[in-house]
UniProtKB/Swiss-Prot annotation:
Post-translational modification summary for this protein: Phosphorylation by EF-2 kinase completely inactivates EF-2.
UniProt-listed Enzyme Commission number(s): 3.6.5.-
UniProt main location, coarse: cytoplasm
Reaction equations catalysed: GTP + H2O = GDP + phosphate + H(+)
Protein name listed in UniProt: Elongation factor 2
Localisation per UniProt entry: Cytoplasm
Binding site for GTP: A26, H27, V28, D29, H30, G31, K32, S33, N158, K159, I160, D161
Post-translational modification Diphthamide, affected residues: H702
UniProt keyword Kinase, yes or no: no
Molecular function per GO: GTP binding; GTPase activity; ribosome binding; translation elongation factor activity
Function, in words: Catalyzes the GTP-dependent ribosomal translocation step during translation elongation. During this step, the ribosome changes from the pre-translocational (PRE) to the post-translocational (POST) state as the newly formed A-site-bound peptidyl-tRNA and P-site-bound deacylated tRNA move to the P and E sites, respectively. Catalyzes the coordinated movement of the two tRNA molecules, the mRNA and conformational changes in the ribosome.
GO cellular component: cytosol; ribonucleoprotein complex
Alphabetically ordered keywords of this record: Cytoplasm, Elongation factor, GTP-binding, Hydrolase, Nucleotide-binding, Phosphoprotein, Protein biosynthesis
Length: 845
């Protein structure tokens, strides 16, 4: 039943207007993979009978077992539209054949870095929302990410079969439930809207909302019904669609449409009367095996003739599933919606180039990307590495933005740390093969033009997680911007092999793990431990399983207890200016520390303010939003740690000699100090260090880096200690769904774990409550299992990293909670148990 060949797909790749790159995004368990199945079935990769049960895009064994998607998987679909379907289509197109590159992404929050990787290489998104659960926390996160990447969303309200079979909703109740979901989604879209995208809100009457039942493989948009009724009412499809949603009522006796309900029994809302009721009648007739009534209805709908003779013999649910699939096939409604309302690469790259390209927006590369020019220079972004079947090699998966990539072509690989004009993070290598991803298998093609997704073989030695590829001659090309992840790796474990001789395997395995997951961080501590950092418990569990089974060939490893990263900050200004002398006693540095204004550290994290900004723009933001003095805002020497972190060092000195010569040394000391704070050698966050005065030796030889760097670091530590230092701990935002009777259990578990509930909502029309709470990450281990035990498995938690919270107790006071934590961290790192006293860092005149 395969309906297309690889050559057909390859031919379509040249027609940019006929390509749609889209990802499927949603909250966990709202039915993305199941819905993707019916789309894949349309392209003839699996049989319709199995659609909904296969979850073809869940390619790993653990994904099939757990029933969750872990990695995002790409698949290319070929779809032929009829002239009838394209009647009013105004966009540009070449012929009726369309190529849809679809990426199914995970919904679970621990894997949201996979979603980011998927969004970067697509132009449109199908947002799936469960009609009963509504818009959840993860729906909001992925929508925000999509709009940030300038990706146009369309909405589908999924699992509507539950309205008919489980909940037995009245038509009016169902309409209100759907309307509420659409309103909630539109609020999010309006909040994070980007003016370059135009209006991103979705409306059923515009055809940008569909209603689907993924498991049963049927779906519809208002267009389907409007076409059916337009002839009967003697109007055109567009006017009919407006009548089928919103406050439009039809009275069957007077045969008139009104805007208000007349009060007569025969007067009903358009949506309820012409869409919900007919579906309900068909489903009920099929479920009750009332075949005479059912087949009469189907003959009126011109569906009866499409049913195969053996299908007419089915009973109950299988009959209902088959009838609905024949009448309202899911792929037609959804693919039609994507083709009509999602942009082609030629259209999307015009407005996406600003958020994609690092360099000047008028050079040859930006222009080629903007015009999606197949004859221009090659620009390709690799957003993730996919392990091949034998686990040893990786495919580099990404999207070609301009030019074309071919087998045997030499390319320049520019990693995330590449700076134009330097040799760092730069390789020139040959592509061995270009392949297309088809879910579980790969198909080789000769070359791929821009606007398409592709996987490359033979570059895995040179790309860690992501990279930009160009032609080998393009030496002035800039990279495509790095991805911003919405979660940060805050949970860490140390790993070691059980048998010491397996150490080389572990090191090699960690290298491969770092490639295969866009977010995980693998580092070696000074103590020689191997550390893996991930987004949460589940993320780490999957990473460790991959490491042991796939990347180390089953060699056994020991894993430490999970450890949480902390940050160090200050909550007051230094009570006096501290002074440190250099080892040769010829130079003195005076410094003080103060906390950043609220929201400034977050702004730096999000990249709104950074070291590469235009100083004028930066000082404007700092003075207007955070109340900085305009002069002071121009005197920021550096951000740190890693030159981009949420701390800064500023220069408030007046007329000091030789200051410029020691600037580099002070900045180097600041990077060192902000990476390892004074309390427990954790990163600092939200501290501004001010250089108040400097007294230097007149002779250059006596004020070299060896004298200044340790001195500056000591004075920063002293400044931190005098400004009321505090520990910051990471806090999760937890969303819990549970029925009313389980609420008591939820509250008691949260109280034991220092959690704090700040919102509780009952879902209208259901007995289910939605709780939102803050929970410290350090308390979250085993939280899920404790919660399920306390509520007999009725509560479902979702944790996502939210913010850093200062701990109330003073870490310098012996016996306080923070002090105990500091001692534990220092013991683990092999430092002296007591943090050093102020007198070690501060000198007297």
């Amino acid at each position: 039943m395969v309906k297309f060949t690889i050559d057909q797909i390859r031919g379509l790749m040249e027609y940019q207007n006929n390509i749609r790159n889209m990802s499927v995004i949603a909250h966990v368990d709202h039915g993305k993979s199941t819905l993707t199945d019916s789309l894949v079935a349309a392209a003839g990769i699996i049989a319709f009978e199995q659609a909904g049960d296969q979850r073809l895009t869940d390619t790993r064994a653990d994904e099939q077992e757990r029933g969750i998607t872990i990695k995002s998987t790409g698949i290319s679909l070929y779809y032929q539209m009829t002239d009838e379907q394209l009647k009013g289509f105004t966009g540009e197109r070449q012929g009726n054949d369309f190529l849809i590159n679809l990426i199914d992404s995970p919904g679970h929050v621990d894997f949201s870095s996979e979603v980011t990787a998927a969004l970067r290489i697509t132009d449109g998104a199908l947002v799936v929302v469960d009609c009963i659960e509504g818009v959840c926390v993860q729906t909001e996160t992925v929508l925000r990410q999509a709009l940030g990447e300038r990706i146009r969303p369309v909405l589908t309200i999924n699992k509507i079969d539950r309205c008919f079979l489980e909940l037995m909703l009245d038509p009016e109740e169902a309409y209100l439930a759907y309307r509420r979901v659409i309103e909630n989604a539109n609020v999010i879209m309006a909040t994070y809207a980007d003016e370059h995208l135009g209006d991103t809100q979705t409306h059923p009457e515009a055809g940008t909302v569909s209603f689907s039942a993924g498991l049963h493989g049927w779906a519809f948009t208002l267009t389907v019904f409007a076409n059916m009724y337009a002839a009967k009412f003697g109007t055109d499809t567009k006017r009919m669609m407006e009548k089928l949603w919103g406050d439009n009522f039809f009275d069957a006796t007077t045969r008139k449409w009104t805007k208000k309900h007349t009060g007569a029994d025969t007067c009903k809302r358009g949506f309820c009367q012409f869409i919900y009721e007919p579906i309900k009648t068909v489903i009920e007739a099929a479920m009750n095996d009332n075949k005479d009534k059912l087949f009469d209805l189907l003959k009126k709908l011109n569906v009866y003739s499409k049913l195969k003779p053996e299908d007419r013999e089915l009973m109950g649910k299988p009959l209902m599933k088959r009838v609905m699939q024949t009448w309202l096939p899911a792929h037609e409604a959804l693919l039609e919606m994507m083709i009509w309302h999602l942009p082609s690469p030629a259209k999307a790259q015009k407005y996406r180039v600003d958020v994609l390209y690092e360099g000047p927006l008028d050079d040859t590369y930006a222009t080629a990307v903007r015009n999606c020019d197949a004859d221009g220079p090659l620009m390709m972004y690799v957003s993730k590495m996919i392990p091949a079947a034998d686990k040893g090699r990786f495919y580099a998966f990404g999207r070609v933005f301009s030019g074309r990539i071919a087998t045997g072509r030499k390319v320049r690989i520019m990693g995330p740390n590449y700076v134009p004009g330097q040799k760092k993070d730069l390789y020139v290598k040959t592509v061995q093969r270009t392949v297309l991803c088809m879910g579980r298998r790969q198909e080789a093609v000769e070359d791929v033009p821009c606007g398409n997704t592709v996987a490359l073989v033979g570059l895995d030695q040179f790309i860690t997680k992501n990279a930009t590829l160009t032609d080998e001659k393009c030496e002035d090309a800039h990279t495509i911007k790095a991805m911003k992840f919405s979660v940060s790796p805050v949970v860490r474990v140390a790993v070691e092999p059980k048998v010491a001789s397996d150490l080389p395997k572990l090191v090699e395995g960690l290298k491969r793990l770092a490639k295969s997951d866009p977010m995980v961080q693998c580092t070696i501590e000074e103590t020689g431990e191997h550390i893996i950092a991930g987004a949460g418990e589940l993320h780490l569990e999957i990473c460790l399983k991959d490491l042991q089974d796939d990347f180390m060939g089953g060699a056994e490893i020991r894993v430490s207890e999970p450890v949480v990263s902390f940050r160090e900050t200050v909550i007051g200004t230094s009570d006096h200016v501290v002074m440190s002398k250099s080892p040769n006693k010829h130079n003195r540095l005076y410094m003080q520390a103060r906390p950043m204004e609220d929201g400034l550290a977050e702004a730096i994290d999000e990249g709104k303010i950074g070291p590469r900004d235009d100083p004028k723009v930066r000082s404007k933001i700092l003075s207007e939003e955070f109340g900085w003095d305009k002069e002071l805002a121009k005197k920021i020497l550096a951000f740190g740690p890693d030159t981009t972190g949420p701390n800064m060092v500023t220069d408030i000195t007046k007329g000091v000699q030789y200051l410029n010569e020691i600037k580099d040394s002070v900045v180097a000391a600041f990077q060192w100090a902000s990476k390892e704070g004074v309390l427990a050698e954790e990163n600092m966050r939200g501290i501004v260090f001010e250089v108040c005065d400097v007294v230097l030796h007149a002779d250059a030889i006596h004020r070299g880096g060896g004298q200044i760097i340790p001195t500056a670091r000591r004075s920063m530590y002293a400044a931190q200690l005098t400004a009321q230092p505090r520990l910051l701990e990471p806090v999760y935002l937890v969303e819990i769904q549970c029925p009313e009777q389980a609420m008591g259990g939820v509250y008691s578990v949260l109280n034991q774990k220092r959690g704090m509930v700040f919102e509780e909502l009952q879902r209208p029309g259901t007995p289910i409550f939605n709780l939102k709470a803050y929970l410290p990450v350090i308390e979250s281990f085993g939280f899920t299992s404790t919660l399920r035990a306390a509520t007999a498995g009725q509560a479902f938690p979702q944790c996502v990293f939210d913010h850093w919270e200062a701990m109330g107790s003073d870490p310098t006071q012996v016996g306080s909670q923070a002090n105990t934590l500091v001692m534990d961290i220092r013991k683990r790192k092999g430092l002296k148990p007591e943090p050093a006293a102020l007198s070690e860092y501060e000198d007297k005149l």
